[in-house]
Structure formats: structure tokens, C-alpha cells
Amino acid sequence: MAGPEGSIFNASAMQIVQIHHYAEGSVTPEVDKLYQDDAVWIISSSFIIFTMHSGFGLLESGSVSAKDEVNIMVKNVVDVVFGGLSYWSCGFGFSYGDIPEWRNPYVGFGKFFYDPTRDYGTRETINQEGWSYASFLFQLSLATTASTIVSGAVAERAKLKSYILLGCIVILIQALPAHWVWDKEGVFYKKGVVDFAGCSAVHLVGGIIGLIATVFLKPRRNRFNEDSVHQMSSPTNALLGTFLLWWGWFGINAGSVWGITGGRWRLGARAAVATIMASIGGGATAITISFVKTKKLQVNFLINGILSSIVSITAICAVSRPWHALVIGSISSVFSIAVLPLLDRLHIDDPVGIVPIHLTSSIWGMIAVGIFCEEDKYLGSATNNRSGLLYSWSFELLWVQLQCTAAILIYSATTGFLALFLISKSPLGLRVTDYEEQIGADVIEHGLAGTNVARYVLEKPLSTRTFQTVTKAITKWKMLAKKKSRQKRMEAAKLKRQEEQETFTNGTAIANGNGNVLHHRTNATESNGTGAPKRSNGPAFNNQITPLAVSSTVSTARNGPSTGRRTESTAIEIEQPIEAVPPEVVAAAVLPPEERPGPSTNSNVSIEASVEKSPSSSTSRRSISIRSSPSIHTVSAISTAAPDSRPSTASATSIISKKSSKNSTVGKFVKAPAPRALSPPDNNPPV
């Protein structure tokens, strides 16, 4: 009789294979105290598995053409979104439904639209609820992985809407093999099949449907022409995706032992070591073959060798020895590289390598269990107390493994082909047109024309129509980006001007970009005893002057041709506010006599204007004075002298003097410059 420790191990072993069905019903104290820590292990492994979608996305986007990089990443996103919705509604129920009247060895029934009951009556029901959530999350992550495998097979050829529907159907197709292999009522579970981490129920299903899909869709345009060379758009992304998948498979294989308590942490460690040893064997074999065959290290050989070796070890990872994993991974790498020329010869266009990585490797992995499986005293129930051909010299386990592999291949291929056929005949359609394939899904499906599309246009010869369409899309994309950038710059400049204006008005100090403090003069406001000066647009705009009584003398002198400088001297007298100066007064100051309007009786402003010409120079000088009757209270003088590149005819004096000439039209076209904004002097300048 086994001791207490042995009974715990045996109880744990039962849970390892039966916890896939959450309602195990075991209520022994030994199992009860394992629930909590083991649930944490399962949930953590599920988180790691979800990161594999990033790896699939990078691997596939780096393997397809540049014009479809974004589209293939989007497909990996919808795999989780709509695939998860499909699994929640029906997939989990078909795999682990527990209604006795409807479930059978071939399909489960019940638990649709997953929502477990919350019965807090006993400890057993509480634990079962926790196991239910953990099991659902883990199985959901595995099911969406099977759907993601198919996305690489249909890359660049399937419509996005059609692929979303196909992904949901793949989830439902995968639900039945999961029931056969992992549910305690499953047909192959009862026969003693061994598949710890989804070699058959995940990778075999996704691989065979991917093969059927890529054959059904036919090769990409010009894929197998004599001058066609298949190149990765971004080998860097593909290698990064390989690393992420490498990391994620530790979560699948080590998490498939379903816990760490009761000695199962040793099983998790064994699965992790088997994973790394298989990848080492596969990678070393792929590198050797690449150097021998091509004298170079081919990136696709390296990726296929590593990933295919990990897939092949998933079925036996928890009971494998390190040298078992090394041999299994090496053989899987050979198969994955050997199948590549066969695919080219048969004109099977597999952009990402779904067939060598998932299909051939999963078949070999299931067969390897029947050869290398060793009975373990802690996992005796997992292998039904059977060993492989190498240890028992019996073909019994190998025969069960072959039966399971053949049944899943036939079922998945048939249902996958039926789904593809129905979708292709539906109004949605399945394959993109030749024109849409040339332009790329990034433009057609998402309206994107970024640098990846531009790079593809430069690298690939396109027809005139396609080139024009893509060029137009790229131009539109660049204009939109430039417009958005310009709007951001304008908004930033506007905010900066507002900040400076507020600082200028308040008289505070601000710091410029160099860290120096800028002191602004304080505007005259009513609070400090003076009225704020108001800016006028001048008579050229509204024919009126600001409501201030002004006494002004404007003197303009233009130097000779030797200097080309222009000097202005302006004297302004600010008086008490009076009514606006009538338009005819302003017109009399700037217009010739023949164009001046009649005198106004309401005007109390006098105008004096004279034009002088120095006898010693050709400089003309005009003095204009506008005065009003009230007494003067404040006088301020501002003198400015600055070079001006405008021609001399732009000044008001030149316009008036030249209007006297016959056939002169300068005054009709030259616009008087707007007056400058004036502010009273600061009697207390900053130190």
C-alpha cells in the first residue's frame, strides 16, 4: 500500500489528466489542499500562452510581403477577439459539456455561453468553481492558438471578413478533438492516448486546416514563376517572433502538468527541460543542414528547425528524458526542412511555413510518444500504465497514437474543406482579386499606405494601374500626415502666442527656450491711470480714426540713391476721448483735391497738409497735422528709424505727389501700410 506521500502523488496524477474537465468531483482532502496553488500556476501559464499571439504576429508579418504586414497582425488580433467569443459561446461546451443525456465519447454538450454557478455551500463546490475558471482560461488560450496557425496559411490571399468567419469555425472544429483527447468521456482518452500539451488537438488541427486552406486558395500571384524569388519582408521581425514563441511554449508545456503542489513541480521542470532540449536539437540540426546545403545560414531553415522541434515535443514533454527530447527535436527539424522542396514542387504556397512547423512535426510528435514514452510512477494514470516501443517492445501505445492522429487528420481536413467551400460560395467570398492582391491588404482592407507599402512598390514591378493606385494612396497618406503635423504646429504656436500675450499684458517675466528671463513692458491700462491705446486699422480699412483726439505730425524723408534708407519721425498727442473723426476729414488728409468729399458741418477737427521739397536734394517731405479743439493733456513722441525694402512709391506722400501726374495709376493699386501698434512709454523700465 502506498504511503501518504504516494497517495498524494496518485491523486495529483489523476488531476493532471482529468482536470481538463473541471467537474472532476474529487473531494479527497489531499486534492482539496492542492487547489489554490495549482490554480495560480495554471493561470500564470495561461498569461504566458497569450503572449504567443505576439510571436505569431511578428513571425507572420516578417514572412509575408511588406504590403500585407499590418493585415496579418490584425488577423492575429481578431483570432483572440472573435475566436474567444466563439469558444466562450460554444467551443468550451462542445469540449467539456457535462449534460449526461447529450454528451458522448465524440462530443460534449452543455456549459454553452460559459457562466459557472456560484454555490458557496461547501468547500468542494467553491474549489470546483475556481478550477472551472482556470481550466476555461487555459483551454481558451490553446484554442485561439489553433486558429492563429491558420492565419499564416491564408496570408495575402484571404479577405479579412471571410477570415474572421473562418477563424470562428476553426475554434468549433478544434473543440471536438479536444474532447476526444482530454475529456474523461473522450473516445481516445479512454483508449489511453498521450498528448500533454496539444500536439494533436491544437497543432495537428491547425496544421491540416492550414494546408487545405493554402491549397484551396491557390498560390499567390507570380509565386512560382521562373524569375520569382520568395523573400521575407522583415527577417528581423520573424526572428523576434520566434523568440516570443519559444518563450510561450514553456507556458504551454510546463502549464500542462496542471499544478506544482504534491510533487508536480518536478513534472513542470521536466517539461521545461524537455522543451529547451528539443529546441536545441532542432536548432543545431537546422544550422548544420543549412551550412551543408547552401554554405550559408538560412533564416527560414533556422526558424523552421527550432519551432518544429518544440511542436514535436509537446505530446510527451512531461514524461520525456532530456536525450529523448534532443532526438525527437532533431528528427523533427529534418522533416521540416525536407518538406520545403516538396511543397515547391507541388506548387503549394505556404508563406509562413505552417506545414513544416505544425503539420509534419505534430504527426511525428504523436508517433514519437509510441516509441519513447516511459511509464512514470507519478503519472501512471496519464499513460494508462503503458510504455512505448523502446521500453516495452509493444506496439499497443503506438497503435493508439496512430489511430488518434489519423482520426483527427481526416476529421479536420474534411470539416476545414467544407468550411472553406461554403465561405467561398457565400456573398462574402474568400479570395481577394488579382488587383487587390497586387495593391495589398494594408491599402484595401485598412486604408493604410505607409512606408511598408512604399518599400514594396520600389522593390516589386507592378502594372501601370496598380502603380498609380498605390502611388495615389501613398500620396494621400503623406498629405494627411503632413496636414496633421501642420495642425499640431499651428496649435502649439497659437498657444505660445497666447501665453506671451498674457505675459506681456500682465507685465510678468517669462523664460525663453535658452533659460533666459524676458521682461516685457507693461501696457497702459485704466488701472494705472491711463487709457489703454487702441489700435486702428487706418483709413484704408474702415475710414475712421480711433476715438481719441490726436494731434500728429508725420514726416517722411527718403535719402538719396546712395543710402537707400528711409527715416520716419512721428509725433503723437493723446488728448481726451472725443467722437470718431468723420470719414471726409480722413479723406481730405490723404486724397487729392479732386477726389475729396464735400465739407462736413459736424466736424470740429482741422487738417493742415503741406509738401516741401528741399532745394539741395530730391527728397520730398509732407507734413500732415490733425488737431481738435479740446485742450491737450498728454504728449508723447516716438521716433523710429529703420531700413525699409519697400519702394518709395509705397508711402502716402509719394502717392499724393504722383497723383498729380497724368496717366498715373499708382494710387489706385498701392495700398497704404497699416499703422503700427503704439504703446505709451514705460517710465520705470526694468533694471
Swiss-Prot record:
<feature type="transmembrane region" description="Helical">
    <location>
        <begin position="323"/>
        <end position="343"/>
    </location>
</feature>
<feature type="transmembrane region" description="Helical">
    <location>
        <begin position="272"/>
        <end position="292"/>
    </location>
</feature>
<feature type="transmembrane region" description="Helical">
    <location>
        <begin position="404"/>
        <end position="424"/>
    </location>
</feature>
<keyword id="KW-1133">Transmembrane helix</keyword>
<dbReference type="Pfam" id="PF00909">
    <property type="entry name" value="Ammonium_transp"/>
</dbReference>
<feature type="transmembrane region" description="Helical">
    <location>
        <begin position="299"/>
        <end position="319"/>
    </location>
</feature>
<feature type="compositionally biased region" description="Polar residues">
    <location>
        <begin position="549"/>
        <end position="564"/>
    </location>
</feature>
<comment type="function">
    <text>Involved in the uptake of ammonia.</text>
</comment>
<keyword id="KW-0812">Transmembrane</keyword>
<feature type="compositionally biased region" description="Low complexity">
    <location>
        <begin position="648"/>
        <end position="665"/>
    </location>
</feature>
<feature type="transmembrane region" description="Helical">
    <location>
        <begin position="134"/>
        <end position="154"/>
    </location>
</feature>
<dbReference type="InterPro" id="IPR001905">
    <property type="entry name" value="Ammonium_transpt"/>
</dbReference>
<keyword id="KW-0472">Membrane</keyword>
<feature type="transmembrane region" description="Helical">
    <location>
        <begin position="77"/>
        <end position="97"/>
    </location>
</feature>
<comment type="similarity">
    <text>Belongs to the ammonia transporter channel (TC 1.A.11.2) family.</text>
</comment>
<keyword id="KW-0924">Ammonia transport</keyword>
<feature type="region of interest" description="Disordered">
    <location>
        <begin position="549"/>
        <end position="568"/>
    </location>
</feature>
<feature type="region of interest" description="Disordered">
    <location>
        <begin position="592"/>
        <end position="687"/>
    </location>
</feature>
<dbReference type="InterPro" id="IPR018047">
    <property type="entry name" value="Ammonium_transpt_CS"/>
</dbReference>
<dbReference type="GO" id="GO:0005886">
    <property type="term" value="C:plasma membrane"/>
</dbReference>
<keyword id="KW-0813">Transport</keyword>
<protein>
    <recommendedName>
        <fullName>Putative ammonium transporter 3</fullName>
    </recommendedName>
</protein>
<feature type="region of interest" description="Disordered">
    <location>
        <begin position="521"/>
        <end position="544"/>
    </location>
</feature>
<dbReference type="InterPro" id="IPR024041">
    <property type="entry name" value="NH4_transpt_AmtB-like_dom"/>
</dbReference>
<feature type="transmembrane region" description="Helical">
    <location>
        <begin position="162"/>
        <end position="182"/>
    </location>
</feature>
<feature type="transmembrane region" description="Helical">
    <location>
        <begin position="196"/>
        <end position="216"/>
    </location>
</feature>
<feature type="transmembrane region" description="Helical">
    <location>
        <begin position="352"/>
        <end position="372"/>
    </location>
</feature>
<feature type="transmembrane region" description="Helical">
    <location>
        <begin position="39"/>
        <end position="59"/>
    </location>
</feature>
<feature type="transmembrane region" description="Helical">
    <location>
        <begin position="240"/>
        <end position="260"/>
    </location>
</feature>
<feature type="compositionally biased region" description="Low complexity">
    <location>
        <begin position="614"/>
        <end position="632"/>
    </location>
</feature>
<dbReference type="InterPro" id="IPR029020">
    <property type="entry name" value="Ammonium/urea_transptr"/>
</dbReference>
<dbReference type="GO" id="GO:0097272">
    <property type="term" value="P:ammonium homeostasis"/>
</dbReference>
<dbReference type="GO" id="GO:0072488">
    <property type="term" value="P:ammonium transmembrane transport"/>
</dbReference>
<dbReference type="GO" id="GO:0008519">
    <property type="term" value="F:ammonium channel activity"/>
</dbReference>
